[in-house]
């Protein structure tokens, strides 16, 4: 399965980028994962012609079998850089229409990205997107700095849950892709 994985933060060092890199490495035999960076997109501005970087990003979303988004939580929601990218992606081409989407996330806070993920699911399910959002188990890892070791690996229990989480997503994908 070809996944376009969106790093939902514009931070130079992002634990969500670290999480996606771990997922890419861990599931290398299962998925073909390409990372996309919201930090490479300009801030959304209504009435402005879609920039080439946005068109390229939208094509990667459209060409993927499914989209994986890793988001932190900022002020009980998603970061403004991710929201801006979503504004671009809902303003013209609508590449998320009927696209299976799976959301993960991590944060330095104990609750992980719980509220950010909840808000993101609401946005992606709205009429401007129409994505098929996976609503099974949730992966929202808290206290990110304590989770990754010096090689970017995660604890065995976390990896076991991540395996289960993606097994559930694969079942969802098989169902919605019929």
Curated annotation (Swiss-Prot):
Pfam families for this protein: FMN_red
Keyword Oxidoreductase in annotation: yes
InterPro entries found in the cross-reference section: Flavoprotein-like_sf, FMN_Rdtase-like_dom, NAD(P)H-dep_reductase
EC numbers for this chain: 1.5.1.36
Keyword match Oxidoreductase: yes
Enzyme class name: oxidoreductase
Cellular component, GO annotation: cytosol
Phenotype upon loss of function: Cells lacking both LJ_0548 and LJ_0549 completely lack the NADH-dependent flavin reductase activity detected in wild-type strain, and show a 40-fold reduction of hydrogen peroxide formation upon exposure to oxygen. Reductase activity and H(2)O(2) production in this mutant can only be restored by in trans complementation of both genes.
Catalytic activity: a reduced flavin + NAD(+) = an oxidized flavin + NADH + 2 H(+)
Assigned protein family: Belongs to the NADH-dependent flavin reductase family.
PANTHER family according to UniProt: CHROMATE REDUCTASE (PTHR30543), NAD(P)H-DEPENDENT FMN REDUCTASE LOT6 (PTHR30543:SF21)
Protein name listed in UniProt: NADH-dependent flavin reductase subunit 1
Species, as recorded: Lactobacillus johnsonii (strain CNCM I-12250 / La1 / NCC 533)
This protein's encoding gene: nfr1
